[in-house]
Regions:
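Catalytic machinery of carbohydrate-active enzymes
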Residues: 1-238
């Protein structure tokens, strides 16, 4: 298939490169493509955490093999492996271009902002239209002096059956990041936006699907990591 040919081309390219260190920090289900990529990096030092791929690693780290901790704790282990024992900050650090920030500041002016991100890229990370309507009505009722701005893929936002909702006039995701920085409250089903809100210490209501398997509790590993957040986990993974 075309996808497999592209994978072989990528592997050939990787064999010609030399990296000081390669990180394989996440657990996955066994994947032949993943194995191909790792085997193509045999001349590089690979620090990995997934026991399925021990044979490809220069060093296998057994941190949190039972997956009971937040992923940020793994970042600490990576830093210790590279730099030795010490105190490390795992706070998120997001760079924003000045022109992007300026456009967002001009867009919001002196208004206060509530962000609603109701439709994630994955089908399991989506609110129903009825849920969206209820949340929107509650925001308009209790945050009457705030602008409620919907973010997400433009084609998805067009499907929301609420007349005249406000969205960003910019398509690039970096503007959503900037809007989050200057917002007052974030409601999101999208894990990326939840963690962006955490970077800026924004009060957040985060909706997560339950994990498909108890062996990989994604709602725990990728929880908001923000003391100003409330996490709601679905009773099912749909």
């Amino acid at each position: 298939s075309t996808g497999f040919l592209k994978m072989l081309t990528l592997c050939k390219h990787l064999r010609d490169l030399q990296f000081d260190i390669v990180l394989d920090p996440f657990e996955t289900m066994p994947s032949f493509k993943h194995s191909l990529i790792l085997s193509s990096l045999k001349d590089s030092y690979i620090l990995g955490f997934d026991q399925w791929y021990k044979r490809y690693y220069s060093f296998y780290h057994p941190h949190d093999e039972c997956l009971k901790e937040h992923m940020s704790t793994r970042a600490t282990e990576i830093l210790k492996h590279i730099y030795g024992e010490g105190e490390f900050s795992t706070d998120y650090d997001l760079h924003l271009p000045v022109d992007v920030e300026d456009k967002i500041k001009e867009f919001i002016g002196d208004t206060r902002i509530v962000i609603i991100n109701p439709l994630g890229a994955k089908k399991i990370c989506r609110l129903t239209f009825e849920q969206i309507k209820v949340i929107y009505q509650e925001m308009k009722l209790h945050f009457e002096n705030y602008r409620v701005i919907f973010t997400g893929l433009p084609q998805d936002l067009l499907t929301i059956p609420i007349p005249e909702i406000e969205t960003l006039p910019f398509n690039e995701f970096i503007y959503t990041v900037a809007l989050t920085k200057y917002s007052d409250f974030v409601i999101s089903v999208d894990t990326a936006l939840v963690h962006i809100a955490a970077a800026y210490h924004k009060p957040t209501l985060a909706f997560y699907p339950n994990s498909r398997t108890p062996e990989y509790p994604s709602h725990l590993i990728w929880s908001p990591n923000n003391h100003k957040s409330i996490q709601i986990v679905s009773p099912t993974f749909t």
